[in-house]
Amino acid sequence: MMLSHNPIVEPFALAHATIVTGDKAGTILRNMTIVVGADGRIEQVAPSIETSIPAEYHYLDGTGKIVMPGLINAHTHLFSQGKPLNPKLATPKGQRMVATFAHSPLGKPYMAATVRHNATTLLESGVTTIRTLGDVGYEVVTLRDQIDAGQILGPRILASGPLMAIPEGHGAPLIALTSGTPEEARTAVAQNLKAGVNAIKIAATGGVTDAQEIGEAGSPQMSVEQMRAICDEAHQYGVIVGAHAQSPEGVRRSLLAGVDTIEHGSVLDDELIGMFRHNPNALRGYSALVPT
């Protein structure tokens, strides 16, 4: 969680709380005190009986309360409320109408307010780090910078900007930059990087939200060569690449291209699992699955 650079009015101590550590063993620590300084940083975590709370610190009784580490949401879309889509807006015509509004002078301030509201909701739900993977424009990059500068309160954000898709592919036209060749794909990645993104997203296959017929979701869309160009361009700047892939073939192609994270995923056989574990084209030599 990022806090304003201005000091908090009062440092505080939360006493007699139960802490869920989140470690592999499932450790639970009871009757603990957490001391937080004026800069918003945790200064001490110790048994309450052993903790001396400075007189100037505000005392909060945590009896019966649970404290846990901040949650991480590694796959978010802040432009969306997470509610079921209106079927009329899921049609090609409906998608074009939504995209036209979202990218208009009237729609851009609306999207900026929406992503800020949704980021606040996540923070208040205990999520302190998020990665967006498909934004309307660069409104989340702006929000991230405002949070990092201490101008507003919010979670840590890794922002992708628009995702990479083929023409009329998954996510287009609302949240995608489209390209038909490896060269065009590199240009799209460069545009996102120049805007300050710290994540890149590829629509490697079709998706459920905008599929128009059975079998479209999971059907491979982007070529290995085009995805490889995207990965190479992003990896030059140390930026990891995630790929929307909802079929075994979509996962395989993405891993061959050097994608760092597979989003959503599919049934995995031993060969695919081996490709995750040893992926020489990925930034760190391996890839990870982010199931949703």
Q: What role is predicted for each listed range?
A:
Residues G70-T76, I130-R131, I157-G161, I200-I202, ...:
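Hydrophobic faces of well-ordered beta-strands that scaffold small-molecule active sites
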Residues S80-M111, L153, G161, A165-P173, ...:
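Active-site gating loops and adjacent loop-to-helix segments of metal-dependent hydrolytic enzymes
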Residues M111-A119, T178-N192, Q246-G250:
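Short, acidic/polar
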Residues L3-E10, I19, D23-M68:
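Histidine-rich, glycine-flanked metal-binding segment
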Residues V127-T129, Q151-R156, V197-N198, Y237-V239, ...:
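Short, well-ordered coil/turn segments that N-cap beta-strands
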Residues I66-Q146, A257:
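Metal-associated gating/positioning segment near the N- to mid-region
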Residues P167, G206-T292:
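Active-site core of metal-dependent hydrolases
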Residues E168-R228:
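Active-site gating/metal-coordination segments in enzymes
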